[in-house]
């Protein structure tokens, strides 16, 4: 079992986290638009996407710890 993570792997995980954070920001913007438009179905969809991405981010952060 490897007790350490290579620099390349850490950078890859960091890039994945950055990508998820950007997508999460995008969904937060779409959520705000849906709330202003009163589209409850779209609001729920965006909330679900934000939550999914947050779970993925947490999993990746655990890998780095």
Feature annotation, model-predicted:
Residues 18, 22-65:
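Short, charge-rich amphipathic interface segments used for partner binding and complex assembly
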């Amino acid at each position: 079992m490897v007790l350490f993570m290579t620099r390349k792997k850490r950078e890859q995980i960091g890039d994945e986290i950055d990508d998820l954070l950007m997508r999460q920001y995008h969904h937060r913007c779409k959520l705000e638009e849906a709330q202003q438009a009163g589209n409850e179905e779209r609001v729920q969809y965006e909330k679900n996407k934000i939550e999914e991405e947050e779970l993925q981010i947490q999993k990746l952060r655990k890998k780095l710890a």
